[in-house]
């Protein structure tokens, strides 16, 4: 349902690329921003980036997994608190505030990015959100769920509801198809059926049968998938499930803007560079690995990716920088909108940064 006008990033077709290395070296710095749009929100004038995404930060409960690389546990040095530690309470008040925020944004086309902790962990919250989305359907040109799939595996209402809400895709995270290796990295609660490989596979098939495309998300790391051989085995497993799109994401560049904790130490110890995979698949001389075809490259305001075709699967190799994100956030233009559990709308994942205001 994505419209032609909605363009959150810049895609360059392979036919226009003579030297992919210049984009690999420049990465997100090759992104050219469009002119911002001025909007009045809660009585103040703000500049918004065209094509931005809106995230109702999904934390109706604490997360039911404890991924070793969890970005929601990263504490930026300017953060006074983490949204992950303040769960949503008082649904009537919360959804009334979200309704007011969406009403004020009417006419500004956005993408809906349903992420945060685990959006499917509390089905009643998700179903109510989807009902409100139906009221504001015209606001969102693209709708994406980011999930570990846990609630989709246990509540039969959720997948049909996503299909009725016309979600463009569900991005389901899986670090490895080997159940034990995946559990070592994603650390699901022992009572979560999705931790089992056969449950995950059946959930992927069922989501696709209901008409919601699935993109599998694999976070590159040295405990799981890190080499081209690992990548190709993962793709073979994905193809067997009928999946048409897989993204391999490098752990984001953190710089020195985060407080040291368990997650930053794990990331530093287990980072696997996506550039190494890019150079193996398409080298500096333009030779492409057998079975792979470059489709193009995409630049965003804090990320860069290359898109390939391998067999029936579209493959994305992606890198990003939370430092670039922080710098863009401080540019005076809201790059993203996040509706936090406190009913505050912000232009940042950090709830005390770029605060538009509270919609109570």
Q: In which residue ranges do the predicted regions lie?
A:
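Canonical Radical SAM [4Fe-4S] cluster-binding loop centered on the CxxxCxxC motif
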Residues: 23-94
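Internal amphipathic alpha-helical repeat/solenoid segments
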Residues: 93-101
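Intrinsically disordered, low-structural-confidence terminal and linker regions
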Residues: 1-26
């Amino acid at each position: 349902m994505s419209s032609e006008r909605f363009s959150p990033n810049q895609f360059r077709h392979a036919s226009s690329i003579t030297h992919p290395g210049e984009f690999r070296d420049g990465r997100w710095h090759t992104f050219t921003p469009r002119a911002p749009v001025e909007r009045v929100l809660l009585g103040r004038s703000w500049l918004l980036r065209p094509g931005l995404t809106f995230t109702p930060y999904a934390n109706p409960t604490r997360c039911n997994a404890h991924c070793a690389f969890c970005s929601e546990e990263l504490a930026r040095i300017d953060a006074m608190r983490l949204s992950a530690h303040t769960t949503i309470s008082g649904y009537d008040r919360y959804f009334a505030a979200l309704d007011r925020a969406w009403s004020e944004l009417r006419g500004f086309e956005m993408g809906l990015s349903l992420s945060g902790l685990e959006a499917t962990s509390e089905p009643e919250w998700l179903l109510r959100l989807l009902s409100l989305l139906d009221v504001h359907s015209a606001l969102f040109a693209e709708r994406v769920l980011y999930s570990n799939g846990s609630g989709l595996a246990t509540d039969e209402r959720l997948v049909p509801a996503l299909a009725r809400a016309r979600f463009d895709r569900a991005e389901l995270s899986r670090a490895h198809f080997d159940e034990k290796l995946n559990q070592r990295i994603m650390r699901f609660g022992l009572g979560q059926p999705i931790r089992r490989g056969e449950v995950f596979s059946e959930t992927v098939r069922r989501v696709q049968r209901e008409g919601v495309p699935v993109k599998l998300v694999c976070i590159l790391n040295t405990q799981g998938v890190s080499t081209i051989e690992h990548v190709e085995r993962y793709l073979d497993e994905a193809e067997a499930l009928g999946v048409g799109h897989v993204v391999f994401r490098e752990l984001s560049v953190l710089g020195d803007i985060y407080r040291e904790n368990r997650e930053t130490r794990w990331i530093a110890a287990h980072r696997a560079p996506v550039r190494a995979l890019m150079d193996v698949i398409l080298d500096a001389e333009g030779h492409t690995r057998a079975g792979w075809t470059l489709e193009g490259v995409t630049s965003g305001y804090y990320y860069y990716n290359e898109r390939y075709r391998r067999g029936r699967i579209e493959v994305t190799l992606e890198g990003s920088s939370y430092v670039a994100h922080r710098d863009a956030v401080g540019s005076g233009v809201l790059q993203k909108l996040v509706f936090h559990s406190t009913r505050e709308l912000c232009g940042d994942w950090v709830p005390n940064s770029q605060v538009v205001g509270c919609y109570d």
